[in-house]
Amino acid sequence: MEKSMASSNLIKQLQERGLVAQVTDEEALAQRLAQGPIALYCGFDPTADSLHLGHLVPLLCLKRFQMAGHKPVALVGGATGLIGDPSFKATERKLNTEDTVQEWVDKIRRQVAPFLDFDCGENSAIAANNYDWFGNMNVLTFLRDIGKHFSVNQMINKEAVKQRLNRDDVGISFTEFSYNLLQGYDFACLNKLHGVALQIGGSDQWGNITSGIDLTRRLHQNQVFGLTVPLITKSDGTKFGKTEGGAVWLDPKKTSPYKFYQFWINTADADVYRFLKFFTFMSIDEINALEEEDKNSGKAPRAQYVLAEQVTRLVHGEEGLAAAKRITESLFNGNLNALSEADFEQLAQNGVPMIEMEKGADLMQALVDSELQPSRGQARKTIASNAITINGEKQSDPEYTFSDSDRLFGRYTLLRRGKKNYCLVCWK
């Protein structure tokens, strides 16, 4: 597809995928995109040491724009991360130290980098940090040059902070209230520095984005645009991107590639085709064909595997995907020979329940400690009934004690009760 053709239809394509929540002056933006490549930006605040799944949709949107010939700017909020965005947050955020925020900025910048192309000629991506323009700004400049253009009357009517202003118990500090000015100035600054004409972000960012559009017009007399992506919801009403263990992170040290892959495999049928539109680069036709195929196959749908494979490859590369599939396969068929030491480390990290034990423990004790069995008596019966495997091998002797050959890589023993209940023993 030709780039210009892709560009003018880009908003329509994003809408077809369900990726547009709100857009300012859609007609003018479509015209602007039709005229040729633009620069656009999305901001990522360092509120933790890793991005999570909620960041993936706007990040992939930057990539979609770049693939259509536009220039993406990934802004990491070294300054805004020190202040904290109050948008739709019920309580004040905890302020983090400058050292912590700086460390997180570096991590997040490294995390964003693989998604974009920083060396492709005209539309190479740019990495920016708003600490560069706020770090040395003095308070008088801030109040005179930025504050003067903001009406408090309008600010207190923004949906994002309304709930905080109407509550006596939590309220909102001046620090967080001023966040809107900082993000607004980011847009004006990037417009001047890089000619940025569009900001994209999550739908909770609408108030901050429109402030930036307004400020850019007042400071530079330029028309710029905003587009928000929807908050991802699940058909059952539960929160997307959370598991019982908390958020699903993009950092493999926080959420292992295996756990990440399993998260997508467990997507409900009611959500999977929508998620393929949000999180992959498959065409709408390919997704519809897959849905049709799944409907008529009479077998379990293939869509979850396609989704898990595509997103895991995007985030963790071929190597991470291969490990996730290898571990999945080994747990399914009970043959652990293919697993590497690093694979066991992933399982210990957050793949299956894990306990640490001293050498010399017997099988009954391990089953009780791992909560695979409630008591030694019950464990004895279960072992005798042939329902327990050690590293994939059945073990029916209740008096069994572990030997060195049970400790894979000198450290790991995988217990299974029945078909699906696992525990990994890590020997001290």
From Swiss-Prot:
Gene3D superfamilies: HUPs (3.40.50.620), RNA-binding S4 domain (3.10.290.10), Tyrosyl-Transfer RNA Synthetase (1.10.240.10). SUPFAM superfamilies: Alpha-L RNA-binding motif, Nucleotidylyl transferase. It is found in: Cytoplasm. Transmembrane segments: none annotated. ATP binds at K242. Residues 361-418 form the S4 RNA-binding domain. One of its GO terms (cellular component) is cytosol. A motif ('KMSKS' region) lies at residues 239-243. It catalyses: tRNA(Tyr) + L-tyrosine + ATP = L-tyrosyl-tRNA(Tyr) + AMP + diphosphate + H(+). Keywords: Aminoacyl-tRNA synthetase, ATP-binding, Cytoplasm, Ligase, Nucleotide-binding, Protein biosynthesis, RNA-binding. NCBIfam families: tyrS. Catalyzes the attachment of tyrosine to tRNA(Tyr) in a two-step reaction: tyrosine is first activated by ATP to form Tyr-AMP and then transferred to the acceptor end of tRNA(Tyr). Homodimer. This is Tyrosine--tRNA ligase. It comes from Cronobacter sakazakii (strain ATCC BAA-894).
